[in-house]
A protein has these predicted regions:
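Aromatic- and glycine-enriched pocket-lining scaffold segments that form the walls
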Residues: 1-37
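Outer-membrane beta-barrel pore domains
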Residues: 22-225
Length: 225
């Protein structure tokens, strides 16, 4: 999508990696992102305690800061079991979104000055860990992953959906445990099967989220490259 303003974002990463003899390798990195999101309305919402407060921006076309700080690390080594790869990454920051989505809008055209387009500034936290274990010299690998995304770290549980808080299901945290396997037929074709156990934060004040939703997912994919 083309840019709709002249403001520039900054993104950078500092990283290092090093081999450990002929059997292992490690790496680590720090990343930073700083940018802005266009607000097409005269209103915006920011957290104060455990609720959103509406701000009168006075005009359309203001901007809300978007900022991420990230850390990542990886370690791989060879053993009698085969190659083991461990990776972890964490991200915190501020993410402007709308009432119905914590993702920042990606506008190709300027949206209208409508209430549903007002920005909500949310402090977020996300992280994941994954393990890939090759099974000896066989073409099979096992995969295990755990990830968490909390789109609004200022509220939890029954605080979400409380009267006059302007919070909704968008502010509920999610976590996933994934297990699967990869079978490499050759260097070009591989088959992957992956099952995700999805868990959502619960709130008695958000319809449909009083309990954990039944939304586990099985994915089977044949890839050619």
């Amino acid at each position: 999508n083309r840019e709709t303003d002249s403001r520039k974002d900054f993104i950078g990463r500092l990283g290092a990696e090093k081999a450990i003899g002929d059997w292992g390798k490690w790496g680590a990195g720090f990343s930073y992102y700083h940018g802005f999101v266009y607000n097409p309305t005269t209103e915006a919402y920011e957290m104060r305690g455990n609720h959103f407060v509406k701000r009168d921006m006075g005009e359309t076309g203001t901007y809300m800061k978007r900022q991420y700080l990230g850390l990542d690390g990886q370690f791989s080594f060879l053993s009698s079991l085969g190659k083991t790869t461990l990776r972890a990454e964490g991200l915190i920051g501020t993410q402007p979104g709308i009432a119905g989505s914590s993702k920042s809008p990606n506008y190709s055209t300027r949206p209208e000055n409508l209430p549903e387009n007002s920005l909500f500034k949310r402090p977020f936290l996300g992280y994941f860990f994954y393990l890939v274990q090759d099974i000896g010299a066989s073409p099979f690998s096992a995969v295990l992953k755990y990830d968490v995304y909390d789109p609004n770290t200022k509220v939890s549980g029954n605080e979400v959906g409380a009267e006059n808080s302007f919070t909704s299901k968008t502010d509920l945290a999610q976590s996933t445990i994934g297990i699967g396997g990869i079978y490499n037929f050759n260097k070009h074709i591989r088959l992957q099967a992956y099952y995700e156990f999805n868990f959502n934060e619960k709130s008695n004040l958000v319809k449909g989220y009083e309990n954990d939703r039944k939304d586990n997912v099985l994915t089977v994919r044949l890839q050619y490259k």
